């Protein structure tokens, strides 16, 4: 098995994608935040002391997608054409499913941008709620979907 993030001497490199043709790339990723149900209800009712938790988390996730190459060393800087963050809440369990979608017309995929976006949005929910709920967890960070490029379409089993 060869690893394309290393040169012949075993040194880390950023993969050369200059010879690839740009194509439309889309990726969707998710992270799940678990809070106490009463904390989630306070978020939904707009009663959190730090303000609009989901609004701020949405903006943080979008900004994070654009900052991915600054956080992931071998990630390519990309001209992102679309970034969105959505939330699905379950008041009974206290779960927030954070879903990030990123799109670009590029030579390499946007999976890392979607993963970073969902993760940072989830971390922002944590940051804004940690004062009132010490038991918050974040998990199930996963790529749900990707398309574009020679590898074609990937859809996570749970999404099929």
Swiss-Prot record:
It catalyses: (8S)-3',8-cyclo-7,8-dihydroguanosine 5'-triphosphate = cyclic pyranopterin phosphate + diphosphate. Keywords: Lyase, Molybdenum cofactor biosynthesis. Its EC number is 4.6.1.17. CDD domains: MoaC_PE. It comes from the Bacteria. Pfam families: MoaC. Pathway: Cofactor biosynthesis; molybdopterin biosynthesis. The keyword Ubl conjugation does not apply. Gene3D superfamilies: Molybdopterin cofactor biosynthesis C (MoaC) domain (3.30.70.640). InterPro entries: MoaC, MoaC_bact/euk, MoaC_sf, MoCo_biosynth_MoaA/MoaC, Mopterin_CF_biosynth-C_dom. PANTHER family: CYCLIC PYRANOPTERIN MONOPHOSPHATE SYNTHASE, MOLYBDOPTERIN COFACTOR SYNTHESIS PROTEIN A. Belongs to the MoaC family. Catalyzes the conversion of (8S)-3',8-cyclo-7,8-dihydroguanosine 5'-triphosphate to cyclic pyranopterin monophosphate (cPMP). HAMAP family: MoaC_B. This is Cyclic pyranopterin monophosphate synthase. The lineage of its organism: Bacteria, Pseudomonadati, Thermodesulfobacteriota, Desulfuromonadia, Geobacterales.
């Amino acid at each position: 098995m060869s690893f394309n993030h290393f040169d012949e001497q075993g040194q880390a490199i950023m993969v050369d994608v200059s010879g690839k043709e740009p194509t439309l790339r889309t990726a969707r990723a998710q992270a799940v935040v678990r809070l106490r149900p009463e904390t989630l209800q306070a978020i939904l009712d707009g009663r959190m002391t730090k303000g609009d938790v989901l609004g701020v988390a949405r903006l943080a996730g979008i900004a994070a997608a654009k900052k991915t190459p600054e956080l992931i060393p071998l990630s390519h800087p990309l001209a992102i054409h679309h970034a969105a963050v959505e939330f699905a809440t379950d008041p009974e369990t206290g779960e927030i499913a954070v879903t990030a979608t990123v799109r670009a017309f590029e030579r390499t995929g946007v999976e890392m941008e979607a993963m970073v976006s969902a993760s940072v949005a989830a971390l922002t929910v944590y940051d804004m709620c940690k004062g009132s709920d010490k038991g918050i967890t974040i998990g199930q960070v996963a790529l749900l979907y990707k398309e574009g490029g020679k590898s074609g379409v990937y859809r996570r089993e749970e999404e099929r």
